[in-house]
C-alpha cells in the first residue's frame, strides 16, 4: 500500500523532525510512504474572513495539485468522524481489501482546509474536537498509521 501525507507548512522544530523521521522509518516495513510538504501562506494577525478564505483557497489549490486521481483521500478535519486506533486499522484494512492501494492523508495549514479539498475527500477524519498545530498533527498521524499497520499485522502495540 502507498501512503501519501500531503501537508501545508514546514516543520521547523528538530524534535518534531526527528519523530517524523522515526515513524517514517518504522512505516517503511509496511508501506511506501511519501510526505509532500507544501508552502503555507502568510496569515496577517488581523486577517479578515475574506482574506482567510483566500489563503485557504491558495493552499487548497496546492494540495489538490498534489493528490493523485487514483488516491483515496482522507482529510483531517475537526468536523470529521472520530475513530479509535482499532477502527482506523479496520478502515485501512477494508480499503486495501476493496482495492484501494493508495491512501492520501491531507493536513491543512493553520486555517484548516479549503472547501474544495474537503469536497475531494473520500473520508473526513477527526482526531479530536481540539485544534492541534499542523506540525504536531503530522507526527500524531504517522504514529496512528504505524499503530494501524501493527494492529492489522497482529503485532503487539502499546494500548
Curated annotation (Swiss-Prot):
NCBIfam families reported for this sequence: PRK00103.1-3 (NF000985), tRNA_RlmH_YbeA (TIGR00246)
Protein known as: Ribosomal RNA large subunit methyltransferase H
Localization, UniProt: Cytoplasm
Enzyme type, top EC level: transferase
Complex and partners: Homodimer.
Catalytic activity field: pseudouridine(1915) in 23S rRNA + S-adenosyl-L-methionine = N(3)-methylpseudouridine(1915) in 23S rRNA + S-adenosyl-L-homocysteine + H(+)
Amino acids binding S-adenosyl-L-methionine: 76, 108, 127-132
Amino acid at each position: 500500500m502507498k501512503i501519501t501525507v500531503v501537508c501545508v507548512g514546514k516543520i521547523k522544530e528538530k524534535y518534531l523532525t526527528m519523530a517524523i523521521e522515526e515513524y517514517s522509518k518504522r512505516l517503511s516495513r509496511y508501506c511506501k510512504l511519501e510526505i509532500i510538504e507544501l508552502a503555507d501562506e502568510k496569515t496577517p494577525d488581523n486577517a479578515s474572513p475574506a482574506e482567510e478564505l483566500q489563503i485557504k483557497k491558495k493552499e487548497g489549490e496546492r494540495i489538490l495539485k498534489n493528490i493523485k486521481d487514483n488516491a483515496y483521500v482522507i482529510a483531517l478535519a475537526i468536523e470529521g468522524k472520530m475513530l479509535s486506533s482499532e477502527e482506523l486499522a479496520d478502515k485501512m484494512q477494508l480499503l486495501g481489501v476493496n482495492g484501494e492501494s493508495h491512501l492520501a492523508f491531507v493536513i491543512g495549514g493553520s486555517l484548516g482546509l479549503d472547501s474544495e479539498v474537503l469536497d475531494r475527500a473520500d473520508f473526513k477524519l477527526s482526531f479530536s474536537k481540539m485544534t492541534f498545530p499542523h506540525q504536531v498533527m503530522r507526527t500524531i498521524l504517522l504514529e496512528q498509521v504505524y499503530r494501524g499497520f501493527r494492529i492489522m499485522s497482529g503485532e503487539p502495540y502499546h494500548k
